[in-house]
A protein has these predicted regions:
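Conserved catalytic cores of phosphodiester-cleaving nucleases, focusing on short active-site segments
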Residues: 25, 44-48, 53-67, 84
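Acidic-basic catalytic patches of nuclease active cores, encompassing PD-(D/E)XK
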Residues: 1-36, 114
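Short beta-strand or tight-loop elements
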Residues: 28-29, 40-44, 101
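Domain-level recognition of nuclease-like catalytic cores that cleave nucleotide substrates
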Residues: 94-130
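Short polar/acidic secondary-structure junctions
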Residues: 37-38, 49-53, 97, 110-113
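Metal-dependent nuclease catalytic cores in nucleic-acid-processing enzymes
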Residues: 85-95
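Mg2+/Mn2+-dependent nuclease catalytic core
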Residues: 65-86
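Structural motif
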Residues: 41, 56-58, 100, 118
């Protein structure tokens, strides 16, 4: 029972992080196209259109309560980057995306709006080069 509660808390915290990232992107002028887009076992947290309208941005959101163990962005390892690239490739083909493509990471450190820090790493990686 305890493990189920811990997972529920973890999922709720992750959703809070994604909601926070969406709010942040809106304030920066991005248009959100998709949230939690899935294809098979692959998922993209946020798919957005850049403020200038020329770039389709695939965003991985990582949230941590503290940086005692590691920074949130450290959780985006090579496997995660590759999987995000595979999912993005499917999305681009499925929806005939013509814009330029970019892969970003939004790192949220903290557990409330009052104590959080947001770091937006634009063009954080290129899955083709992995």
């Amino acid at each position: 029972m305890r493990e189920h509660q811990d997972m529920a808390t973890h999922n709720k915290f992750g959703k809070w992080g994604e909601d926070t990232a969406v709010d942040y992107l809106h304030k920066q002028g991005y248009t959100i196209r998709e949230r939690g887009w899935r294809h098979g076992k692959f998922e993209i947290d946020i798919i957005a259109l850049s403020p200038d309208g020329i770039t389709c941005v695939f965003v991985e959101v990582k949230t941590r309560r503290s940086d005692e163990v590691a920074l949130p962005s450290d959780a985006v390892d090579e496997k995660k980057m590759r999987n995000l690239g595979i999912a993005a490739d499917v999305y681009v083909k499925m929806f005939d995306i013509q814009e330029e493509l970019r892969f970003d990471v939004i790192s949220i450190l903290g557990s409330t709006a009052e104590n959080m820090q947001i770091e937006h790493l634009e063009d954080a990686f290129n899955p083709v080069l992995l």
